[in-house]
């Protein structure tokens, strides 16, 4: 907030991973942001769509190779995945009025991911155009995290150095 990281009382502010994504299935521990909007789930959906065994070797690189090549099944799964993530970004934006949401992790390096995610996010607003309550709702920018797949490690290091500075 106001240009500073918000850490929260227990230093978990901004940890959106464990937000429940389906109130009707509260007991289902897989219905949270970390499970539904993860690379693991993206690959799970792709395996299912392609009728591959659950243990079929697959990673983000091979998935995006298929998607970038225009494979219909990969693009269908990517649209579904990006819609799920976009809904959560919408919720976060409405709740906190954030300026930007930074997407991290290894797949965040894929231009197709960000393009598809932005398209899904814009589609949410377009699907409710004309609804009175939508008029004043904020919109955020979706950007790649500066440290992509190393974001967690950089965050830990930054927190450590900040804490050490306060001690000196």
What are these regions (language model features)?
Residues 1-2:
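A cytosolic small-molecule/anion-sensing beta-strand core signal
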Residues 5, 21-168:
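ATP-binding/phosphotransfer module of carbohydrate and carboxylate kinases, centering on a glycine-rich
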Residues 8-15:
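A short acidic/small-residue loop/turn micro-motif
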């Amino acid at each position: 907030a106001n240009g500073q990281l918000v850490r929260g009382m227990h230093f978990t502010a901004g940890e959106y991973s464990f937000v429940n994504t389906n109130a009707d299935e509260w007991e289902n521990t897989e219905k949270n942001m970390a499970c539904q909007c993860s690379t693991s789930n993206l690959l799970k959906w792709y395996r299912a769509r392609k009728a591959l065994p659950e243990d079929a070797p697959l990673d983000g690189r091979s998935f995006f190779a298929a998607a970038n090549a225009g494979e219909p099944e990969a693009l269908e799964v990517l649209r579904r995945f990006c819609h799920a993530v976009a809904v959560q970004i919408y919720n976060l934006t409405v709740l906190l009025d954030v300026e930007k949401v930074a997407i991290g992790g290894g797949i965040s390096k894929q231009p197709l991911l960000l393009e598809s995610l932005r398209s899904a996010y814009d589609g949410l607003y377009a699907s409710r155009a004309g609804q009175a309550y939508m008029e004043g709702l904020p919109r955020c920018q979706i950007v790649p995290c500066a440290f992509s797949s190393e974001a967690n490690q950089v965050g830990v290091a930054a927190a450590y150095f900040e804490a050490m500075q306060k001690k000196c």
